[in-house]
Amino acid sequence: LAVPSFQIMLANAQIRTATQAMYDGLQLARVEAIRRNDRVVFAKGTGSDWTVTVEGGAVVQTRSSSEGTRQATVAVTPAGATQVTFDSLGRIVANADGSATITQLDVDVPTSLISAADSKEQRVTITTGGAVRTCDPNAAAGTGTAC
């Protein structure tokens, strides 16, 4: 009886950790763009991997999904988008390669790990003004955590 509850707790902890990692990477990219007075790119890799680089230049920081979030899955909106670029004012600008800009990341775990009903999916949203926010897509409207 305790084992399934523990599995649910661990899976949801991975969701929270991966969500926080995505949020932190996006905030890092935004802050570095402002600090460096340059364009900085947040690039999402596979799973919850990401890399922050100065556009056309040096890597600022990289995070691997093996850092505690191996089971987490991240769905990107729009589909196929892989990066977002911040300008020196912390706003979103067009990616240098012309690719679509990430506007939303939905973090979950596979239903083979825990049921969808037990999963506490999280979302990271990015506005054109550069604001990054985490929210719960399943929370009731009007609550502080609702998207």
Give residue spans per PLM region.
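N-terminal helix-rich module
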Residues: 1-31, 35, 39-147
